[in-house]
């Protein structure tokens, strides 16, 4: 059984095959996707049309609009297939269905859904007039064009006036359809994770214990200040952190030390001499507690031993910390986490750290190497309608990775990334009692 990654890869390969006009390969890749979505059937229908097989295209578009009964562009293309098969009544019906799915809007822009095409209401009416011309209904065709002109489409006035002139001369009109080569593409955020990631990297010697090693790229190993102070003791900074709260460490800080290969601390002890070596001003040190939350994708050989697995995980966590979003806990009643997005904001945090054993509390969050902007709490249950959606239940906390537009967010929860309606959630700091689930608005469908 193919994985989600394999299916996305086949989808992408199919798109590339369409770009080079290799119709057979494109159909093969699109057909390999298990349980195809409406988008995939739509792609296959478009390929069949480009390959000159309207019968096969009609079957594919039938599947597409069955899977997604609101796919206006699917009804448009099915109407084109019916027109090419001289099924004029069915073609008119499909164009009427496409117009109905526009729901009074002047256009539907499919760009955000992966198709570089904007379906215009006037184009659907234009196609209806074209079918009426083919049936010899010239008066009806002229009336349909008048309706299209009444919608005042931007940039289409000349096209419609030229079409009206042809109809008056009883010259047939050519159908308008999705441009050749345009199909639904997989979301870019999925494509970024298709290539295998090398978490170990390449080994490189940066120091040698052999004094006579003359390799120009290698420097003799030097004794560090920590070694001179005594290798048996922890670093001054670690001691400073551990000297508070009786030597107890927060789980997030413990994980971050393990991930970076730092020394595993022992019980708290007097560290005055070590602090004198590290800095002349002990007050310049701040106790920082970092809570780390990461979702780490790993590719591990089956049967990997525990030690090797820990090494892989520590390397992956180290990379995640380079990309994670830092936040600090604000003062006040809500105690919300405020993102640290710039160097200036971090310096402002340092200036306002209170002088107390509690010190500074930070949070570092990341999802698949992507920073978390902020968190939201679900006010209602949301069931995923498509693979790119992220479902959740009332009360779930979701990490927001991107604000797609005014109505949609991209988020992460339980190792999964997807998009969801903004109206189903509220910021974590302002969570209120849930209200009845709102009815979806036409503009929120995708």
From Swiss-Prot:
Disulfide bonds: none
Keywords attached to this entry: Cell membrane, Cytoplasm, Membrane, Repeat, SH3 domain, TPR repeat
Stretches with biased composition (Polar residues): 217-232
UniProt domain SH3: residue ranges: 371-430
PROSITE patterns: PB1, SH3, TPR, TPR_REGION
GO process annotations (BP): regulation of hydrogen peroxide metabolic process; regulation of respiratory burst; superoxide anion generation; superoxide metabolic process
Domain of life: Eukaryota
UniProt-listed CDD domains: PB1_p51
Annotated region (Disordered), positions in chain: 213-232, 252-282
PB1 domain sequence ranges: 287-367
Tissue: Widely expressed. Detected in gastrum, spleen, uterus, small intestine, colon, inner ear, and brain.
Chief localisation class: cytoplasm
Subcellular location, record wording: Cytoplasm; Cell membrane
Positions of the UniProt region annotated as Mediates interaction with RAC1: 1-224
TPR repeat start and end residues: 7-38, 39-71, 73-105, 122-155
CC terms in the record's Gene Ontology section: cytoplasm; NADPH oxidase complex
MF-aspect GO terms: enzyme binding; SH3 domain binding; small GTPase binding; superoxide-generating NADPH oxidase activator activity
PANTHER family given in the database record: NADPH OXIDASE ACTIVATOR 1, NEUTROPHIL CYTOSOLIC FACTOR 2, NEUTROPHIL NADPH OXIDASE FACTOR 2
Family named by the database record: Belongs to the NCF2/NOXA1 family.
Task of the protein: Functions as an activator of NOX1, a superoxide-producing NADPH oxidase. Functions in the production of reactive oxygen species (ROS) which participate in a variety of biological processes including host defense, hormone biosynthesis, oxygen sensing and signal transduction. May also activate CYBB/gp91phox and NOX3.
Domain notes: The SH3 domain mediates interaction with NOXO1 and NCF1 and has autoregulatory function. The TPR repeats mediate interaction with RAC1.
Subunit note: NOX1, NOXA1, NOXO1, RAC1 and CYBA forms a functional multimeric complex supporting ROS production. Interaction with YWHAZ prevents the interaction of NOXA1 with NOXO1 and RAC1 and its targeting to membranes, hence reducing its ability to activate NOX1. Interacts (via N-terminus) with SH3PXD2A and SH3PXD2B; the interaction is direct. Interacts with RAC1, NCF1 and NOXO1. Interacts with a greater affinity to NOX1 phosphorylated at 'Thr-429'.
The protein's name in its UniProt record: NADPH oxidase activator 1
Gene name as annotated: Noxa1
């Amino acid at each position: 059984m193919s994985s989600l990654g394999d299916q996305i890869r086949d989808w992408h390969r199919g798109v590339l095959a369409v770009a080079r006009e290799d119709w057979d390969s494109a159909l093969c890749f699109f057909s390999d996707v298990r349980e195809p979505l409406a988008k995939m059937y739509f792609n296959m229908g478009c390929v069949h049309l480009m390959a000159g097989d309207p019968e096969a295209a009609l079957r594919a578009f039938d599947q597409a609009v069955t899977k997604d009964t609101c796919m206006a562009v699917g009804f448009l293309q099915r109407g084109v297939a019916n027109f090419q098969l001289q099924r004029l009544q069915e073609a008119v019906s499909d164009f009427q269905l496409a117009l109905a799915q526009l729901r009074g809007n002047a256009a539907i822009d499919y760009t955000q859904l992966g198709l570089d095409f904007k379906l215009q209401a006037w184009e659907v009416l234009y196609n209806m007039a074209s079918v009426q011309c083919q049936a010899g209904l010239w008066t009806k065709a002229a009336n349909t064009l008048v309706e299209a002109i009444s919608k005042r489409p931007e940039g289409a006035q000349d096209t419609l006036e030229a079409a009206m002139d042809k109809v008056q001369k009883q010259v047939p009109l050519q159908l308008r359809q999705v441009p050749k080569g345009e199909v639904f593409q997989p979301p870019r955020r999925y494509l970024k994770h298709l290539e295998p990631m090398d978490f170990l990297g390449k080994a490189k010697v940066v120091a040698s214990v052999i004094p006579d090693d003359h390799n120009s790229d290698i420097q003799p190993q030097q004794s560090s200040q920590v070694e001179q102070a005594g290798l048996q003791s922890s670093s001054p900074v670690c001691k400073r952190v551990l000297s508070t709260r009786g030597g107890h460490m927060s789980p997030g800080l413990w994980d971050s030390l393990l991930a970076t290969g730092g020394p595993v601390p022992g019980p708290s002890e007097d560290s005055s001499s070590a602090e004198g070596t590290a800095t002349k001003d002990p007050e310049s040190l701040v106790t920082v507690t970092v809570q780390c939350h990461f979702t780490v994708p790993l590719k591990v050989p089956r049967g990997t031993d525990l030690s090797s697995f820990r090494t892989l995980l520590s390397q992956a966590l180290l990379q995640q910390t380079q990309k994670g979003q830092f936040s600090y806990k604000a003062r006040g009643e809500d105690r919300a986490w405020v993102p640290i997005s710039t160097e200036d904001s971090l310096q402002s945090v340092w200036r306002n750290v209170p002088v107390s054993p509690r010190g500074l509390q930070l949070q570092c969050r990341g999802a698949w190497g992507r920073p978390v902007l902020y968190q939201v709490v679900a006010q209602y249950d949301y069931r995923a309608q498509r693979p790119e959606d992220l479902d959740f239940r009332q009360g779930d906390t979701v990490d927001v990775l991107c604000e797609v537009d005014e109505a949609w967010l991209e988020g992460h929860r339980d190792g999964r990334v997807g998009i969801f309606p903004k109206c189903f959630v509220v910021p974590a700091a302002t969570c209120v009692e849930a209200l009845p689930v709102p009815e979806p608005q036409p503009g929120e469908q995708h």
